[in-house]
Amino acid sequence: DVDGDGDPDFIGARYKPGLVAWFERPENPLKDEWKMRIADDELIGIHGVLKADVDGDGKLDLLANSGQPTGKFPNSAAWLKVPENPREAKRWKRFIFADKDAPGLSHYLGFGDLNGDGRVDLTLAAKGFPDPKFGKGEWFAWWEAGKDPTKPFKKHLLPGIHPGATNIQPADLNGDGKLDVVASRGHGKGLLWFE
């Protein structure tokens, strides 16, 4: 529910040229047109968007990667704050949390408080480009949120080399009350978890 009117809207993204947009649910969602509004058009190489309350204000924000090595935000990832009036906003406010430190064709995002400090940390994976000069990838990482979520976060690589690294999600897999990380190596490469 992007606009706060009580019904669900849709969020979508385009890879290249990059675009994050939301579609406002009409009165009759089966017959009427869903109006598209742009949230961001400067992130390039978006593989997915995810909603999370990054800044702790009780409202959902959007996460998106900028996985291409070119453009205004190369090899980066961002979160977008939903404006007070999303119907009227030309673009949403963008905060880069991974500032040029996510090379290698980053893919999907996750979130959770990985270090137990009460702040939302963010996760990301990169599978690698066919041409390694653009970034070898093959990593899983998490970005530690600081006191000010509008500033870049601190990157922590998880151990190992991970061909096909695509999905990464925090979850308490062993039931000890602490978040672990489950991660997939796409294209038949496997599934693993980090404690």
What is the role of each PLM region?
Residues 1-195:
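Beta-propeller-forming repeat regions
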